[in-house]
Amino acid sequence: MEQNRPKQTDQQATNAALAALAAAGNAFALGQLWEVNKGFVRRQLWQWYEKNQTVADSAGLSFEDLVQEGYFAVDYAAKHYSAEQGSFTTYLSYALLKQIRTATCGEHTRGVIT
């Protein structure tokens, strides 16, 4: 019996396919996944940066540094994403917060970053 899930959009299907290829080690697919989602990553990071600029400044991070960290979040999300978990961008949002926490507070932290 099929679950009542909303139908995937073309963008979600593209993200899922590119993430699967990137997880299998396809560097070109990872680059394409980054290009397709770069605008989303920048918007998410800018929202965080506007609210938490003092945190970023104290860690010595500019907005462009955070965008570079965003690439690592895309890589992490691609390697750990499963289509059963929902949309790739939702998973990527959590990966971005994880990467921000790592970049601003270090590898092992229990701090709350909003």
Predicted regions and their residues:
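Alpha-helical promoter-recognition and RNA polymerase-docking modules of transcription initiation factors
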Residues: 1-110
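Short, intrinsically disordered, charge-balanced linker/junction segments flanking boundaries
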Residues: 112-114
